[in-house]
UniProtKB/Swiss-Prot annotation:
Protein name: Filamin-A-interacting protein 1
Main location per the UniProt record: cytoplasm
UniProt keyword Cytoplasm present: yes
Originating organism: Mus musculus (Mouse)
One Pfam match: CortBP2
InterPro entries in the cross-refs: Cortactin-Actin_Reg (IPR050719), Cortactin-binding_p2_N (IPR019131)
Region span, Disordered: 1-73, 875-898, 949-976, 1104-1192
Post-translational modification Phosphoserine, affected residues: 138, 979
Length: 1214
């Protein structure tokens, strides 16, 4: 239904293009079309500058339609076709109207789901309609899905934390109830103990009264005992008289026993004499047996020594015999060989003798003169020689005969030696037989010795029996003597016993008194220990109460933190609402501007350019707004991290509660020990009761048991003292833990202060968001200035400034202190410091829980990436560049300045300036920043360019002829073409020993020029320099970072190579003919356009960034006629770089952990006025900086493609 050949234009990005209806009218209708053509000619340069992905189409109006006659009735075929196209345009317009009416019926709920708000309904409907036409987005997308899922996740997290808090509160309540219950138990036990102690004191008083009564009884008992003792004395005197008569009888018996003893003593003397004789005999026999044993031992040792020596000698002799036999065999073999040789020599002797005889005969013949031939003389000479040889052999024969004789002598000697050895072996065998006989004799003597030992033992037993009988007799005599002494001692002992009994009773009374006093002292000590224990128990209770209060405070702090996070999220939502309202305002303004332009122009071409301008502006608007949204989302993520760290603090509180449980367990153990002590006291009381029962019995047993009990009590008191000491030590430990808790409180107060500081920083953030809104308004004013006016020109002639993408932040020490990210990083570091102090104090964390820094690293890396798109930072950094952008552009050709239009990414403004030099056919590309201090401060574009020399491999492709144009104007002709060369260069880091050739000693460069493809230029290029303009293609540069290497200043030159690397770190790449060093004016055949990429200032210690520069320049250079071959040179010259990179760059290279956020940076033109910025003719530049975490290599992909006349509907692709 639609014809796209002349009517509409479809964009690669999906933007709507309006149809172009032809205007057929009379002379009055011809004027607007001519005005449109003029506007088109004036804005031809601007048509080339588009966003990335747009497709340029050159629409050629038919000549017949312009030269149309005024005859309305006689219509030609072309007129009919034109009418048909008008009808199609009207149909297209009708369809658009139908579509607009449909979109007006869309519900506000759909718009809210798609755009996030339904407030400016008309604007959103228009946007919805354009989106459906362009098919930019899927209609089913819902903006609220992701935030709702995040909200649900937050609610789940909140529920979980609430449940955990409830568990903690329940645990605390349980602990509190348990402690209250234990305190009540302790009170009851204390009252029971006091009652028991009162009962015990009453018992002791009763015991004292009982002991007094016992003393009185003892006194009466002593008086009675004295009377009984007097009676016993009388009885004992009577017994003494009887004992004296009994002693006389014993004396008589004693005399009889003495006589018997005299007889027995004579017998004993005889027996002793016999014993002495027997003992002497035994001594003599034992002495002989000892001597025999020693002799036997010596003989055995000698025998063993000789046997071992003989065995060794026998083995040696056998070995010698074997050696001699083998030697004899060898000598015999030699003799056989020599005898054969002697036979051979004898045969030769015989032959020699024959030869001598023949010689003699010949000599005789010669002397007689019978034979005078020369042949005979030769034979004679040969025979002489042979004779001489034979004589030499005779000498050898004599030598061999002498050797044979010597060998015979040696054989005889060896035979003689072997006979001697055999004789020695026979002698040894005889000696062995003698030794065996000696062994038999030794065995006999051993058996005799054993018999003698047995006899000796029998004699010893007899003597022992006799001695025993003597001892029995002596003991009987001694017993008789002892009986007399005993009778005398009994009287003395009875008297002593009486005195001892009296003194012992007195001692028992004294000991009882001492025991009572000691028992009272022990009871006092036990009471003191109980009091101390209760005091320590009270301290433990205080500590537990403090712990509970601390946990409550921490819970309150948590709730306050959550409320603050909630308020922050609310503020973020409000800011998002403000942003949306600002976006709606911007959309309304753009719509009103579009309506004004439609009313002013009324022509489709102007309308198309307005749409293009709107697209460009839309890309420029979205960048800062996307920046703000991303910044707010990053703030939300940081707050979430903060919440996680607070959860870590909550885990530490749980640990303190675990320690509180351990203290409670220790308290229970101490209570058990106290109960054990009370049980021991009860046992003591029980034993005292037993002692009272024993006192009623015998006095002696009572006193012994009392002493035993007293010792037991002393031992128990020592044990009690040791336990008291242990209790004191534990109490000291508890006090130390209380000190640790106070330290925790101090750290907690520090954390509160940090939190207050964070609140102030958040307020500062709110102020900075207001600055953001102001900057939005400024950007809107700037976009109004960029819109084209009625004559097709822009309201303000904007300088050549492009927005490059740079993902690394710019360093600024003064500005770094003011950013919220720096504050959050510092607060994280301080919290980590506090936690490490806590761990040093003694609260050790478990091994499975990693540190806070490992789980939540500081935001330093994010800071380095985010810094360049923080708006208040960007205002300061880009301040000096604003006046430079509005200045005139130096060194510019006749055409419009080359403009670089960028993709809508974030970044700091860089300025790429292209300056052509028509005399030398060169072009210079310069990349600068607003100020030299800030340029490349985060190593943005080419971070490691300066101190490294690249290694570039060039692969030329075969020449490609320029295509013939399908339709071309007669004025254009292919007079100038570009060299069809494809360059593929690979540069990687190489070790010095791995390099070869001209690049052996030079380190690898981080720059890789992947492909440089230059094709033939279209015929439109080769026109006169004054009248025609050159359409430009695109050049794509891909730069990825690589590691730096230490530079070695070298100068390499190869005559056959197209690359020369010089000491000034310049890389000259030749596309076509050989490189020429002469800087003179170039000839028409070999002119070389040069692209110079010159980074002005590169500073160190920042992360390598990625960037994209998309450039479709409308800088039209006039080309020279007659140049059929062009030599292109790319010179990449780093001015200054630094040699080091900081530690923060490591994390930036890790692609898995962090993704570097790109920043949008406008580039000013004017740091160095002498280095004008450039694009080579026929190419537009697209620079892509891509980070690689693994290879860290840098690629520069250069593609040159010139648009030919055949590709009228599409441009070159980067």
């Amino acid at each position: 239904m639609r014809s796209r050949n002349q009517g509409g234009e479809s964009s690669s990005n999906g933007h709507v293009s309006c149809p172009k209806p032809s205007i057929i009218s009379s002379d009055g209708g011809k004027g607007p079309s001519e005005d449109a053509k003029k506007n088109k000619a004036n804005r031809k340069g601007e048509d080339d500058v588009m966003a990335s992905g747009t497709v340029k189409r050159h629409l050629k109006p038919s000549g017949e339609s312009e030269k149309k006659t005024k005859k309305p009735l006689e219509l030609s075929k072309e007129d009919l076709i034109q009418l048909l196209s008008i009808m199609e345009g009207e149909l297209q317009a009708r369809e658009d109207v139908i579509h607009m009416l449909k979109t007006e019926k869309t519900k506000p709920e759909v718009l809210e789901a798609h755009y996030g708000s339904a407030e400016p309904e008309k604007v959103l409907r228009v946007l919805h309609r354009d989106a459906i036409l362009a098919q930019e987005k899927s209609i089913g997308e819902d903006v609220y899905e992701k935030p709702i899922s995040e909200l649900d996740r937050l609610e789940e997290k909140q529920k979980e934390t609430y449940r955990r808090m409830l568990e903690q509160l329940l645990l605390a309540e349980k602990c509190h109830r348990r402690t209250v219950y234990e305190l009540e138990n302790e009170k009851h036990k204390h009252t029971d103990y006091m009652n028991k102690s009162d009962d015990f004191t009453n018992l002791l008083e009763q015991e004292r009264e009982r002991l007094k009564k016992l003393l009185e009884q003892e006194k009466a008992y002593q008086a009675r005992k004295e009377k009984e003792n007097a009676k016993r004395l009388n009885k004992l005197r009577d017994e003494l008289v009887k004992l004296k008569s009994f002693a006389l009888m014993l004396v008589d018996e004693r005399q009889m026993h003495i006589e018997q003893l005299g007889l027995q003593s004579q017998k004993v003397q005889d027996l002793t004499q016999k014993l002495r004789e027997e003992e002497e005999k035994l001594k003599a026999i034992t002495y002989k047996s000892k001597e025999d044993r020693q002799k036997l031992l010596k003989l055995e040792v000698d025998f063993e020594h000789k046997a071992s020596r003989f065995s060794q000698e026998h083995e040696e002799m056998n070995a010698k015999l074997a050696n001699q036999e083998s030697h004899n065999r060898q000598l015999r073999l030699k003799l056989v060989g020599l005898s054969q040789r002697i036979e051979e020599l004898e045969e030769t002797n015989k032959s020699l003798q024959k030869a001598e005889e023949e010689l003699q005969e010949l000599r005789d013949k010669i002397a007689k003169g019978e034979c005078g031939n020369s042949s005979l003389m030769a034979e004679v000479e040969s025979l002489r020689k042979r004779v001489l040889e034979m004589e030499g052999k005779d000498e050898e024969i004599t030598k061999t005969e002498a050797q044979c004789r010597e060998l015979k002598k040696k054989l005889q000697e060896e035979e003689h030696h072997s006979k001697e050895l055999r004789l020695e072996v026979e002698k040894l065998q005889k000696r062995m037989s003698e030794l065996e006989k000696l062994e038999e004799a030794f065995s006999r003597s051993k058996s005799e010795c054993t018999q003698l030992h047995l006899n000796l033992e029998k004699e010893k037993n007899l003597t022992k029996d006799l001695l025993n009988e003597l001892e029995v007799v002596k003991s009987r005599v001694k017993e008789l003597e002892c009986s007399e002494s005993r009778l005398e001692k009994v009287e003395l002992s009875l008297k002593d016993d009486l005195t001892k009994l009296k003194s012992f009773t007195v001692m028992l009374v004294d000991e009882r008194k001492n025991m009572m006093e000691k028992i009272k002292q022990e009871e006092r000590k036990v009471d003191g220990l109980n009091k101390n224990f209760k005091v320590e128990q009270g301290k433990v209770m205080d500590v537990t109460e403090k712990l509970i209060e601390e946990s409550k405070k921490l819970l309150k702090l948590k709730s306050e933190m959550e409320e603050k996070v909630y308020s922050l999220t609310k503020e973020r939502d409000e800011l998002m609402g403000k942003l949306r309202s600002e976006e709606e305002r911007s959309c309304e303004l753009s719509c009103s501007v579009d309506l004004l332009k439609k009313r002013l122009d009324g022509i489709e071409e102007v309308e198309r350019e307005i749409n293009r301008g709107r697209l460009c502006k839309g890309s420029e608007f979205t960048c800062p707004e996307d920046n703000k949204i991303r910044e707010l989302t990053l703030e939300i993520e940081r707050l979430k991290k903060r919440l996680q760290q607070l959860e870590v603090v909550e885990g530490d509180l749980m640990k303190t509660e675990d320690e509180y449980d351990q203290l409670e367990q220790k308290f229970r153990t101490e209570q058990d020990k106290a109960n054990f002590l009370s049980q021991q006291l009860e046992e003591i009381k029980h034993q005292m009761a037993k002692n009272k029962a024993i006192e009623k019995g015998e006095a002696v047993s009572q006193e012994a048991e009392l002493r035993h009990r007293f010792r037991m009590e002393e031992a128990k008191s020592r044990d009690l003292q040791a336990e008291v000491q242990a209790l004191k030590e534990k109490i000291h430990e508890l006090m130390n833990k209380e000190d640790q808790l106070s330290q925790l409180q101090v750290d907690y107060s520090v954390l509160q202060q940090r939190f207050m500081e964070e609140e102030t920083k958040n307020k500062n953030m709110g102020r900075e968001v207001l600055n953001l809104t102001k900057e939005l308004e400024l950007s809107k004013r700037y976009s109004r200035a960029l819109r084209p006016s009625g004559n097709g020109r822009r309201m303000v002639d904007v300088p050549v400034a492009s927005t490059g993408v740079q993902t690394e932040a710019v360093c600024g020490d003064a500005a770094e202190e003011e950013t919220p990210a720096v504050f959050i990083r510092k607060s994280f570091q301080e919290e980590n410091h506090i936690m490490s102090n806590l761990r040093q104090v003694g609260l050790k964390k478990p091994m499975e829980r990693s540190s806070v820094l490992d789980r939540y690293p500081p935001a330093a890396n994010e800071l380095t990436m985010r810094k360049s798109w923080i708006p208040w930072m960007r205002k300061r950094e880009n301040g000096p560049s604003a006046p430079q952008e509005k200045g005139p552009r130096p060194n510019q050709g006749t055409g419009h300045p080359g403009e670089l239009v960028l993709a809508p990414k974030q970044g700091q403004p860089l300025h790429i300036r292209v300056t052509p030099d028509h005399e030398n056919s060169t072009a210079t590309l310069e990349i600068t920043s607003p100020t030299s201090e800030e340029f490349f401060s985060s190593t943005t574009v080419i971070p490691t360019l300066g101190n490294q020399k690249p290694r570039i491999t060039i692969i030329p492709s075969p020449n490609v002829m320029s295509q013939k144009p399908k339709s071309a104007d007669p004025t254009l002709g292919p007079e100038r073409a570009m060299s069809p060369v494809t360059i593929t260069t690979i540069s990687r880091e190489k070790s010095p020993e791995g390099g070869r050739g001209a690049f052996a000693d030079r380190p690898a460069s981080p720059i890789q020029i992947m492909t440089v493809s230059t094709s033939a230029a279209p015929p439109e290029i080769a026109v006169s320099p004054d009248s025609q303009e050159v359409p430009m293609g695109r050049t794509i540069l891909k730069v990825t970072p690589e590691k730096q290497t230490v530079p070695t200043p070298m100068r390499k030159y190869n005559a056959n190579a197209n690359i020369i690397t010089t000491e000034d770190n310049k890389i000259h790449i030749h596309l076509g003919s050989q490189f020429k060093r002469s800087p003179g004016p170039a000839a028409a055949e070999g002119v070389s356009p040069v692209i110079t990429v010159r980074p002005v200032n590169v500073t160190a210690e920042k992360e390598v960034s990625t960037g994209t520069v998309l450039r479709s320049p409308r800088n039209h250079l006039s080309s020279r006629p007659g140049a059929n071959k062009v030599t292109s040179t790319i010179t990449i010259t780093p001015v200054t770089t630094s040699s080091t990179r900081g530690t923060q760059s490591v994390s930036g290279q890790d692609g898995s952990s962090q993704r570097p956020t790109p920043t949008r940076i406008p580039m000013s033109k004017g740091m160095k006025a002498g280095k004008p910025v450039v694009a080579a003719p026929g190419a537009g530049n697209l620079t892509k900086f891509q980070p690689r975490a693994e290879t860290q290599s840098m690629k520069i992909e250069l593609k040159k493609s010139a648009a030919s006349s055949t590709a009228s509907l599409g441009g070159g692709k980067g």
